[in-house]
Amino acid sequence: MLDNFDLLGVKISVTNLAKACQAIEDWIKTGRRAYVCIVPVATIVNCQDDRQYREIVNGAGMNTPDGMPLVWLGRMKGYKEIDRTYGPDLMRKFCALSQDRGYRHYFYGGTPETIKLLVSKLREQFPRLNIAGYFAPPFREIREKEETSVLGQINAGRPDILWVGLGSPKQDYWMHDHRNELDVPVMVGIGAAFDFIAGVKKQAPLWMRKSGLEWFFRLCSEPKRLWRRYQIGRAHV
């Protein structure tokens, strides 16, 4: 059972990579259905303006702290074991341990090119990884028949874990909305992890990730896409 603390009405789980992997594995073993939100500061900000989104995030089985400010706050509250639980690192670590457990993985999100690169990289890094399937949805609004077909494909693959890379908040809404239609123990909204692991986008240097400056690296890398996210966050602060 994970401890949680409240930050501006948003649940943050007291976790680290090892504890997060253990929680996911426990849910797979028990068959409990849960979704996991990877929570950076931007998600906290978005939750302040959107009550429905806040309820969706708070309904997750685990909200991992994906940002050093959240880790620092948790440690100030006395949770010494809390550490940044970064999406790409969580995905790599769970894929690594899955090789000996036989857990089945399904990947949903990204572009057709990115997801093929992702699967290729994962098979290269984790040769015994059991990949149940993958699908990149179209950028346009997906039609109801298409959605039904994709959900059927996912269920037919019998995955133990579904990695959802649609970006936040879209992936969090998607997991919540389809949680009762999918026979999958665990879904994880993994954000840009598909792009990073596939090698499509560069990750910030480790020192920037550890010092809480990854946002600056990403803003410089993708100013047109991310300026609004970080400007809104600064305005709230």
Whereabouts are the PLM-identified features?
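Conserved beta-alpha
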Residues: 71-153, 157
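Short glycine-rich anion-binding loops that position phosphate/pyrophosphate groups of nucleotides
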Residues: 40-44, 166-171, 193-194
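Short, flexible loop segments at boundaries between secondary-structure elements
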Residues: 136-142, 185-221
